[in-house]
């Protein structure tokens, strides 16, 4: 702003993470703006700031294009109240233990055949949908346990699961999000083993 140079915003959705949020966060956003998509909040946040020339958005489907056009044509800037609301929402999101993977796949291929992005994507999806078991004593434990284990085996073949990680760290150097990948894989593997043994 000081130098009068305009900005171009890349990855306004953090690789899709801001469009795929936990259920209680999505409900909160929908309650405030029933007509707005989840993604539109991030687009409007990026576009509201002065000095933004362009917001770049990767689109896979026609509905993404339609939603982007609706968000920016015309852009409805966020109010001060909206910005406070989003700041509070961001704080709530930080309390959820998702892994900040954007599925860029720079960590691939793993020399041991581990499907790192899919493992993280599956874990984040379960967190967002409330299918992470906290304790064997919780009411939802059996449902969450079954949901995680069954969907994990469907999403990731056995020979590509987190249990295969030896902690070589080759993947870590390539991650633009600076995720400590071996540690996260070991955390997921421990969680899976605890579910299998009912020792949470």
Which stretches of residues belong to each language-model region?
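Structured C-terminal cap/extension of enzyme domains
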Residues: 1-200
């Amino acid at each position: 702003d000081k130098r009068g140079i305009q900005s171009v915003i890349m990855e306004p959705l953090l690789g899709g993470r801001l469009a795929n949020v936990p259920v209680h966060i999505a409900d909160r956003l929908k309650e405030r703006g029933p007509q707005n998509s989840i993604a539109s909040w991030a687009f409007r946040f990026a576009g509201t700031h002065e000095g933004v020339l362009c917001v770049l958005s990767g689109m896979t489907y026609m509905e993404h294009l339609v939603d982007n056009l609706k968000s920016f044509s015309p852009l409805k800037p966020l109010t001060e109240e909206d910005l406070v609301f989003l700041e509070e929402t961001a704080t709530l999101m930080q309390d959820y233990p998702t892994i900040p993977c954007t599925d860029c796949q720079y960590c691939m291929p793993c020399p041991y055949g581990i499907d790192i992005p899919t493992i993280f994507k599956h874990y984040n999806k379960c967190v967002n949908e409330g299918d992470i078991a906290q304790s064997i004593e919780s009411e939802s434990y059996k449902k969450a346990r079954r949901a995680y284990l069954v969907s994990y085996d469907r999403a990731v073949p056995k020979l590509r699961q987190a249990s295969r990680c030896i902690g070589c760290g080759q993947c870590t150097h390539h991650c633009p999000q600076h995720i400590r990948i071996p540690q996260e894989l070991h955390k997921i593997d421990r969680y899976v083993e605890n579910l299998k043994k009912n020792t949470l």
